[in-house]
């Protein structure tokens, strides 16, 4: 029988493994859908629309899932996310639409919506589980920061690997067969989690909980959530459609695009995992994290301004290396900002309300991704220009504006833990 700290560590390891497996399929599915439907004639706006319901369902799911987990436990939402993803992969493999048209777009949008719901069920459960498993107090704050950084960083490294896996599956065995491989592997992980997960992960269930409690009453969480909307909107407005299609327009193969995006996300994940050590945060984690967020938020704005000016001044032939290098610099600074956000939401949240607070916060995260995904396709197609230069520049300028707004909101975050008003 596993008990005490060993039990918490074992539960954390199982949750992390399930989350890793899910994010591998999530990254692979994103690259499979993006590249497969691009070669089947979908234009940038159509591709962006394929991901809209994915992000919208993430918003809806986070709100509802936080309430469900508070009522019935984290185990239920974790397993539901894994089951839903297996089903989505299988359904998309069977459907396998290849023609451009309203029916195909709606079908893939619907299935992507299921994938979005699955992703946020799993993510909310995994992130909330860390708060449940880590003890309170200043030592707990430091441990919470380390565990959040490792979970978030490793998740993104695995998702980056998923990009590579998705591109590789498309190039080797094709769209449908690749989806079946992903569905089968995730089903095995689900069975392992069901068999091995220790009791008690769910935390304290609350029977009498009005649905209105899904909305946060904490000014700190509301500010952080608004900053998250702009932060992730800034990333996805050029990352979702603009960057992959820009590289493809420069003659890159599917495998090359997938490999670069994979390495970028994996490196981004490594930086996230190393953030507590990079910033040397040991004690006073909340205050030091807020101060670091002010510095690194400004750094993001400066990187994007410099990259935008460089893209504007160069010809298309010299842009590929510049965009790749700029994306790497942006990824490092963004990873630090994102990790600090992920820690602060759990630090500000009350243990008994963690699923509600995390659900509300990641609803904002999904809203930012939704906004960014939509604008990425619309802006890139509207301003595309020669080989996508003007479209990419327009995406970068919007990303700069969003990062500036995220920074402005973040500078007013409190430097101590705040109690959430009674729900």
Predicted segments — roles?
Residues 83-101, 299-316:
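C-terminal ends and interior cores of transmembrane alpha-helices
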Residues 49-67, 262-275:
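Central cavity-lining transmembrane alpha-helices of secondary-active solute carriers
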Residues 20, 88, 101-122, 320-337:
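Hydrophobic core of transmembrane alpha-helices in multi-pass small-molecule transporters
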Residues 2-56, 220-264:
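Helix-loop boundary and gating motifs at the non-cytosolic
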């Amino acid at each position: 029988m596993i008990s005490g700290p060993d039990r918490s560590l074992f539960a954390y390891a199982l949750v992390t493994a399930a989350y890793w497996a899910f994010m591998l399929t999530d990254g692979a599915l994103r690259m499979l859908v993006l590249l497969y439907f691009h070669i089947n004639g979908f234009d940038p706006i159509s591709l962006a629309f394929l991901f809209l319901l994915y992000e919208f369902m993430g918003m809806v799911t986070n709100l509802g899932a936080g309430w469900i987990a508070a009522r019935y436990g984290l185990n239920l939402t974790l397993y539901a996310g894994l089951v839903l993803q297996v089903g989505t992969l299988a359904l998309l493999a069977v459907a396998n639409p290849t023609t451009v048209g309203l029916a195909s777009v709606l079908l893939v949008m619907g299935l992507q919506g299921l994938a979005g719901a699955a992703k946020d069920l799993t993510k909310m459960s995994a992130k909330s589980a860390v708060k449940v498993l880590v003890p309170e107090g200043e030592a707990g704050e430091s441990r919470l920061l380390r565990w959040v950084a490792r979970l978030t960083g490793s998740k993104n490294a695995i998702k980056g690997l998923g990009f590579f896996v998705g591109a590789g599956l498309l190039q080797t065995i094709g769209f449908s067969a690749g989806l079946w491989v992903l569905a089968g592997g995730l089903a095995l992980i689900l069975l392992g989690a069901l068999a091995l997960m220790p009791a008690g992960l769910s935390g304290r269930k609350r029977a009498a909980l009005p649905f209105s409690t899904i909305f946060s009453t904490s000014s700190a969480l509301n500010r952080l959530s608004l900053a998250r909307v702009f932060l992730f909107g800034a990333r996805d407005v050029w990352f979702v459609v603009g960057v992959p299609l820009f590289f493809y327009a420069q003659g890159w193969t599917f495998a090359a695009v997938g490999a670069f995006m994979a390495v970028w996300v994996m490196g981004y994940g490594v930086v996230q995992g190393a953030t507590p050590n990079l910033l040397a945060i040991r004690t006073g984690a909340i205050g030091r994290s807020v101060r670091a967020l002010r510095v690194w938020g400004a750094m993001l704005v400066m990187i994007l301004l410099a990259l935008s000016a460089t893209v504007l001044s160069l010809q298309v032939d010299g842009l590929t290396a510049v965009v790749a290098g700029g994306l790497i610099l942006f990824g490092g600074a963004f990873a630090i900002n994102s990790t600090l956000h992920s820690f602060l939401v759990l630090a500000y949240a009350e243990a008994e309300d963690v699923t509600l607070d995390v659900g509300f916060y990641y609803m904002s995260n999904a809203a930012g991704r939704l906004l960014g995904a939509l604008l990425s396709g619309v802006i890139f197609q509207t301003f595309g220009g020669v080989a996508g230069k003007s479209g990419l520049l327009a995406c970068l300028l919007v990303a700069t504006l969003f990062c500036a707004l995220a920074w402005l909101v973040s500078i007013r975050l409190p430097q101590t833990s705040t109690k959430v008003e009674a729900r």
